[in-house]
Amino acid sequence: MRAFLFASVAVLQVAFTDVVGACSLPQPAGKVILTVTGHIGACSDQREVRLDRAMIHSLPLTEVRTKNPWERGRATYQGVLLRDLLHYVKAHGKMVELSALNDFHTEISIADTKKYNILLAFRRNGVELTVRDKGPFFVVFPFSDVRKLETEERFAQSIWQVNHIEVK
């Protein structure tokens, strides 16, 4: 009987470790500024990944210098490539739906995130983006580097005030 109980506890321990171990991302220590849900393989809360500013800044950062319809001239944006964020959360799907604080939504194919350097920007010209100025995140396409991206469809996908991404 004692051996059976010991074996049962050991099996439960392994099963519990597998479930907890699957959630390899840390919990946010600060204010959550981005939530990723949907078809993801990593988790901090079983169904979603919640990220604070420090977690975002710990990912590989990239700069994109480009022009867009909302700025005069070129601006330098710093942030995380959307494909790097999707890799971080182990996304597996075909599309991402990005949502803004004002409930505006747009979709971008995951194939496009792999093909183009689509940036989830949190800084413009060295200054953190605030909610008043398109923050916390602004989707920036490399319009100056890839001229064929200068379309109404891509302009509509250049969503700002992003706070949620759902992988579909």
Task: Give the role of each language-model region.
Residues 6-15:
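Bacterial N-terminal signal peptides
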Residues 1-4:
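Positively charged n-region of N-terminal signal peptides that target proteins for export
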Residues 21-168:
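N-terminal intrinsically disordered, low-complexity segments enriched in P/E/S/T
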